[in-house]
Amino acid sequence: MTAAKDRILELRAELDQHNYRYHVLDEPSIPDAEYDRLFHELKALEAANPELITSDSPTQRVGSVALTAFTQVRHEVPMLSLGNAFEETDMREFDRRVTEGLDLPAGDLFGGGAAVEYSCEPKLDGLAVSLLYQDGVLVRGATRGDGTTGEDISVNVRTVRNIPLKLHGTGWPATLEVRGEVFMSKAGFERLNASQLEVGGKTFANPRNAAAGSLRQLDSKITANRPLEFCCYGIGQVSHDISDTHIGNLQQLKAWGMPISHELKLAKGIGECLDYYRDIGERRNSLAYEIDGVVFKVNSIADQRELGFRAREPRWAIAHKFPAMEELTELLDVEFQVGRTGAVTPVARLKPVKVAGVTVANATLHNMDEVARLGLMIGDTVIIRRAGDVIPQVVQVVMERRPEDARPVQIPESCPVCGSHVERTQLVKRSKGKETISEGAVYRCVGRLACGAQLKQAIIHFVSRRAMDIEGLGDKSVEQLVDEGLVSSPADLYALKFEDIVDLEGFAEVSSNKLLAAIEDSKKPGLARFIYALGIPDVGEETAKVLARSLGSLERVQQALPQVLTYLPDIGLEVAHEIHSFFEDAHNRQVITELLGHGLQIQDQGELGAEFAASTTLGGFLDKLHIPSVGPGGAQKLADKFESLEGVMNADWLDMRQALPEKQANSVREFFALPEHRQLAEDAEKQLRDFGMHWQSEKKVVEGLPLAGETWVLTGKVELMSRDVAKEHLESLGAKVAGSVSAKTHCVVAGPGAGSKLTKANELGVKVMDEEAFIAFLKGHGISA
């Protein structure tokens, strides 16, 4: 027993220290796997010795038996709200009141008085909580409630990973009440909503609602699985003073294991407070969490006591609020727009309202599933949210304000742009040899490029900088070309003549010639760039690069079957089906043929990528057929036993049972009993042979890209090609292209106007190549400029 107890105490101390370094200092000291090993060792020891379990053990964060209701608790020191400032003059008036209250020399509304020291920190948008520690051990957690009475949420706060169950170090007061905010980061909020959607659970309108809803769960096991965090901002009741300043208090709390704001600062005078407010405001959208303002507090504890309180707020603190990110308004109508892939999506037309300082009259509704989830009707009062550069969105309906004449939102039967039929396509999730119909659906206009909206968006994407990079073709120019009937597919761009465009609005002789030259210059795209330009659903730049690097040629990309495509990194079966379906479409194949007929020469084509070609084994192939109940291990057993696809498909029952348990053996025989499954497997195997990547083939591959493992940097102007094209060429040779120079940089390509990067390269002794040498280098590797 003594050995077990000693080891338990040792593990708890070690895990507490690792938690502190990870959650408070942001300095993890061991890998996650090692932490998990220590945690599971402690859990096993406590399970074997339940009498040694204590409330402050790290294992007690997982949640306990669900409650039927929360009990009420009284705050010994009331949790008061703060006064608000909305304008700069409000802040200057607050500072004037503080200086007068402290009998300091006063200035006017624009300064001139004594410089009071203030603590500054962001006002987190979460749920205020009180944590009570007795002799360093967490004994109670409570909500703010009405400031005097809150709810006991002790079992839930124990599940928040960065709240210490026992304080670190020594010297803490016998009674210490820590106050702070429980919140959810933006990334955690997105993950939670995504997981809720997957299981058909409730989604949340914003991180604050998610945090509040999670913390007030009667079942603490649910809370334990939510990505909640805590940030300390002060103290309540305490048996003796900690420091003579507010910031001193927080720094000591941090030493005892409490997480505090990384943005905590000291400001001298109101001017520095306003500078801090502006700085945080500018960085607000890049912060990992949501804030709704900045809190300023007189830093001196003695001065705080002298200033005291008025009504239900302290005289020594104020919250300088940012413009609200959410507002109420009326949904006037729902209109429908058509995107590049034909998806018909709803857009909310709103009674104009100011949100975060910007007038909003339209908001995204994403799709009809979202309309149904919100229960949205035309005429509803809705909550609009706008955060940073994110398109405003409707996040909630205020049901109690729904008018009697509210109308349902209905998808149009015909395309609002071209009049073609709108079809409903059920979303399909493919896994383990079967197709699962999900609840979601997408509505598409069947008009394709005959639909002006789809055509315009397809052309805009095709000519964009990261696609074919045709300079001089902005959105308005594309709309003109389509509206004038000059362009009805991407291939038509390469048939344009001077006389076609010179008389168009915004064009003249010089701009027309420049455009034609830009179109001509785009005729030698890299394979990845060309694939991306085609606008294949779910294929972004990175997936296009994977396709190009792995398959090596446009022909193989066009021919690849879904089962073959899933060998590629980060391409699952659903994306593989999208790619295959795109190239199966006769119209898409015709557009590609026409593009090549206009003289496009796809660059960077060659053999299969070595990593891709080497990835094929019979076991892996069988696994990718997604035979029900047969995972990677079972697939490998089949490969070891039968050594060929034909052997597996034609195996008798006894041989199959020698390889697999009865259930799996039955599943394999039932799978290959279906002619369509046999055909699918045979077609995929044949394609692997045709591509030269069959497990029995002698593989012709790019064994090692010449620049594999090297880091290159581009600086200055590359005159014979765009920087993006130069980057593509280097990546096609295996290089990583970085944005800064370090001792690990292999080479810097320096064109005219190269600056600090060239200087640093010379200082570090990094190889430097001018543009002429770079072009020659590319030609030496079969790439023309």
Curated annotation (Swiss-Prot):
Sequence similarity: Belongs to the NAD-dependent DNA ligase family. LigA subfamily.
User: Which gene codes for it?
Assistant: ligA
Keyword annotations of the record: DNA damage, DNA repair, DNA replication, Ligase, Magnesium, Manganese, Metal-binding, NAD, Zinc
Q: Which organism is it from?
A: Pseudomonas fluorescens (strain Pf0-1)
What's the name of the protein? DNA ligase
A single Gene Ontology CC annotation of this entry is: cytosol
For this protein, the Enzyme Commission number is: 6.5.1.2
Protein function: DNA ligase that catalyzes the formation of phosphodiester linkages between 5'-phosphoryl and 3'-hydroxyl groups in double-stranded DNA using NAD as a coenzyme and as the energy source for the reaction. It is essential for DNA replication and repair of damaged DNA.
Give the residues the record marks as binding Zn(2+): C415, C418, C445, C451
**Which cofactors does this gene product need?**
Mg(2+); Mn(2+)
Source organism phylogeny: Bacteria, Pseudomonadati, Pseudomonadota, Gammaproteobacteria, Pseudomonadales
Could you say which residues bind NAD(+) here? D32, A33, E34, Y35, D36, S81, L82, E121, R144, E181, K297, K321
Q: Note the InterPro entries from the entry.
A: BRCT_dom, BRCT_dom_sf, DisA/LigA_HHH, DNA_ligase, DNA_ligase_AS, DNA_ligase_CS, DNAligase_adenylation, DNAligase_N
Q: What class of enzyme is it?
A: ligase
**Taxonomic superkingdom:** Bacteria
Q: Which residues form the active site?
A: K123 (n6-amp-lysine intermediate)
GO terms assigned for molecular function: DNA binding; DNA ligase (NAD+) activity; metal ion binding
What positions does the domain BRCT occupy? 702-785
Catalytic activity from the UniProt record: NAD(+) + (deoxyribonucleotide)n-3'-hydroxyl + 5'-phospho-(deoxyribonucleotide)m = (deoxyribonucleotide)n+m + AMP + beta-nicotinamide D-nucleotide
